[in-house]
Amino acid sequence: MTLDLEKADAVAIAAAIRAGEITAKAVVSAALERIAVRNEAFNCFTAVTADTALTDAQKIDQAIAQGENPGSLAGVPFAVKNLFNIAGLTTLAGSKINAENPPATQDATAVARLKQAGAVLVGALNMDEYAYGFVTENSHYGSTRNPHDPTRVAGGSSGGSSAAVAAGLVPLTLGSDTNGSIRVPASLCGIFGLKPTYGRLSRAGAFLFSSSFDHIGPFARSVRDIATTFDSLQGADASDPICTTRPAERSLPQLNKGIEDLRIAVADGYFAKGAEPEALEAVAKVAQALAVTTAVTIPEPHRARAAAYIITASEGANLHFANLRSRPQDFDPATRDRFLAGTMIPANWYIQAQRFRQWYRDRVREIFQNVDIILAPTTPGVAPLLGQEKMVIAGEEVLVRPNLGLFTQPLSFIGLPVLSVPIQRPGALPLGVQIIAAPYNEALILRVAAVLEAQGIVSAPIVQ
């Protein structure tokens, strides 16, 4: 069987490399060639690590020649949002200011763990400055364009990560999610994006935005790739005090268990309003495929979103306060304005937001006593045009940048695990549906996604 390296998923590539059907060097060389030819059209990469990638690929081939198993992701090319430390590169976090920092001396924990699983790093990816945004329109490094329509945004803040997978440049990337920065671009680019439980994966060596909310997670074009990557990334890490010490729970062995024992519901109320019809139709399509007839009401999600904004803006502004005072001109104007607004939030608002967060977490946990999975839209509509400032949602004109996260913020606010799954629509742009579970139940989410994938309801073909 001849492997189409552009279309094959990570699991298939790794299996072919381990079986000796193709070399890791050939796979990585092909990825580097695709990046060289096609990246200019989408502006996904801010750095390409060609030399080290080819060296690492050769080491994988040598290990296989000696009868060793290099890991579940042997020879698979991957790339990461440029807020992850990569040894030898400066960690930009999408900013001009960070470009003055010295190169990182070691890889972020997540990068190191994927390398330990045999994956080969090929570069760093574009993002909104300091991860504050949903569009990846960056005044320093340019806009990342959506492979489905290059006149439109890829989403953000992990836009380079989602577009690189959707365009077939690499099968696997890492991003981060504070308020929706994995799920929004996954939806707009038509791929899978997992935001695990808060604290499940180590963030050590990643440039954080708002520590109360920051998560890391993978993008891929198949459910098994998400599961394999998630499993490779799990594990305690003393370098990140938020990272859990609870044992890893492998999701890949559970992937084909089916969903007969799962109680699944659709989120109504807030999550069934304030969206374009096609976003709600995507949820209905998934619900129908899963024979879901139950609905649940998540209480006060609009307040959760407001509280998430207060905490995010306050923590982000505090982190960057010195530079906001001394060199405001060096920030992306859109980011600077939001951070400056954050400096003016009263401390008692922040305290009230954190108190509400506890109340909200308890109420949502009560819902999960009666259901295992909740379905909701990922974004309120399809990808907006580059430079578009306003969009119409449910007949109302609203700002693009904050409102792309309308349905994601109330969920990351309490650290729930969520997978955005892609609904492809012939002749139209893709949309995502969120599959949501209680903390540490990623394996249940992935089982649901696997059923939908097997039915052909969700899929992530590369954009030709």
Regions found by a protein language model. Name each.
Residues 43, 240-248, 262-263, 268-270, ...:
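Flexible, acidic loop-helix segments that line cofactor/substrate-binding pockets
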Residues 13-19, 79, 98-102, 214-221, ...:
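Short, well-ordered beta-strand elements within core beta-sheets of diverse protein domains
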Residues 73-216, 269, 376-397:
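Short glycine/serine-rich loop/turn segments
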Residues 24-29, 58-61, 276-297, 321-326, ...:
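Acyltransferase
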